[in-house]
């Protein structure tokens, strides 16, 4: 396949830019960009738990879909923090119960089981990130 005329022009333009820039083709100035994940209400209701509890919930979610999420709902009642600070504790509790029910009911078609495992992984990731924040260690994920 022969390169088209447009491809040749693009390559020539890139070569001209690279020759004009002594640092190479890239002209980035080292700007730091911060990205924040926008979470839905169910995802934001996942509590920040201690690491061992999060691992137990992941284990439970792996073998009995929704059970770890159900257990994590009760950690909200015990004071676990979530990303929904403006919602009442009971509302966050019921959001977690709803997530557990969704996982249980859709486990029949494997969707709930996979969702349950990912939910447990999110619990562990949140527990790890919370541990880093408490210790003041810079975090790289």
From Swiss-Prot:
Report how it sits in the membrane. Answer: Multi-pass membrane protein
Metal-binding among the record's keywords?
Answer: no
Which subcellular locations apply to this protein?
A: Membrane
Which residue windows are transmembrane per the record? 51-71, 87-107
Q: What is its main location?
A: membrane
UniProt organism field: Homo sapiens
Q: Which Pfam families match?
A: Spec3
Q: Which InterPro entries does the annotation name?
A: SPEC3/Stum
Identify one Gene Ontology CC term for this UniProt entry: membrane
Query: Phosphoserine-modified residues are where?
Result: 26
- KW Nucleotide-binding (keyword) present: no
The name on file for this protein is Protein stum homolog
**Family to which the UniProt record says this protein belongs:** Belongs to the SPEC3 family. Stum subfamily.
Sorted alphabetically, the keyword list is:
Membrane, Phosphoprotein, Transmembrane, Transmembrane helix
């Amino acid at each position: 396949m022969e390169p088209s005329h447009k491809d040749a022009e693009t390559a020539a333009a890139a070569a001209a830019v690279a020759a004009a820039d002594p640092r190479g083709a890239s002209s980035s100035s080292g700007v730091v960009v911060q990205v924040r994940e926008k979470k839905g209400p169910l995802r934001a209701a996942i509590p920040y738990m201690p690491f061992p509890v999060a691992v137990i919930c992941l284990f439970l979610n792996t073998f009995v879909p929704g059970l770890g999420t159900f257990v994590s709902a009760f950690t909200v009642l015990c004071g676990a923090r979530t990303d929904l600070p403006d919602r009442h504790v009971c509302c966050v509790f019921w959001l977690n119960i709803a997530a557990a029910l969704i996982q249980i009911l859709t486990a029949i078609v494997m969707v709930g089981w996979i969702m349950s495992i990912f939910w447990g992984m999110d619990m562990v990731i949140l527990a790890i990130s919370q541990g880093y924040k408490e210790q003041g260690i810079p975090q790289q994920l």
